[in-house]
Design a protein with these regions (language model features):
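Alpha-helical membrane-protein architecture signal
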Residues: 38, 42, 46, 78-82, ...
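Residue-level signal for discrete positions within transmembrane alpha-helices
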Residues: 44, 48, 84-87, 91, ...
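N-terminal signal-anchor/first transmembrane alpha helix
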Residues: 1-8
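Transmembrane alpha-helix signature in integral membrane proteins
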Residues: 41-69
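Membrane-interfacial helix termini and adjacent extracytoplasmic/periplasmic loops
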Residues: 20-39, 99-140
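Glycine/proline-centered hinge or cleavage motifs at structural transition points of membrane proteins
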Residues: 93, 168-169, 182
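Membrane-helix/interface signature in polytopic inner-membrane proteins
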Residues: 150-163, 171
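Cytoplasmic-entry segments and transmembrane alpha-helices of multi-pass inner-membrane transporters
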Residues: 62-101
């Protein structure tokens, strides 16, 4: 209900402004200066797409490999704490992830950029507030979902798929990556 009311409020107040400046100009405008009545959101849209793509590039491989470990390799005494840790990560509010990013990740990226600058590999050191930082944090945020869904999908694959692959001479790794994961994609 609260989200619906927020959306109604935003649209009710935003539609007249979009009519005045034009929807296409609003979407494709490159400058956002409300005081000068310039309302372009293209850089925000492109930035969101970059951050999302970066998060997928970081989060999906790590999440799938963690799921493979948990479903196929993890000893029972390690599985329970690891499963609890991934479930705990899912319960952390996004504000806490953002705070962690500002306090920990931004300084690390800043130091990394400074090291690259000193080595002469980049022209400016940067301040750490970047698409890379946002992608890393968002990638961390999506890990619990990817790990949970991938692991449960892998466990749902019938055992005879895996056993049949091993019986045909495939290694354990090849059986996992060429049989189990493709079969789990539907889940």
């Amino acid at each position: 209900l609260a989200v619906a009311l927020i959306c109604i409020f935003l649209f009710a107040n935003g539609i007249p402004a979009m009519r005045e400046i034009g929807f296409i100009k609003f979407i494709t405008g490159e400058i956002w200066r409300p005081n000068s009545e310039q309302f372009g959101i293209l850089p925000m849209i492109v930035g969101s797409l970059y951050v999302t793509a970066g998060a997928i590039i970081f989060g999906v491989p790590i999440g799938i490999l963690t799921s493979v470990f948990m479903a196929m390799y993890c000893p029972k005494q390690i599985y329970k704490p690891l499963k609890a840790a991934t479930e705990l990560l899912a319960g952390i509010p996004s504000v806490i992830y953002g705070f962690f990013g500002l306090v920990v990740v931004v300084p690390l990226i800043r130091e990394f950029g400074t090291a690259l600058y000193r080595a002469g590999l980049v022209s400016k050191p940067g301040n750490g507030n970047s698409i890379l930082t946002a992608s890393l944090i968002l990638g961390m945020m999506i890990l619990p979902t990817i790990i949970g869904t991938t692991e449960s999908a892998m466990r749902a694959v019938p055992a005879h798929y895996y056993e049949g692959s091993l019986a045909l001479g495939a290694t354990k790794e090849r059986s996992i990556f060429r049989v189990i994961i493709p079969a789990a994609k539907s889940g």
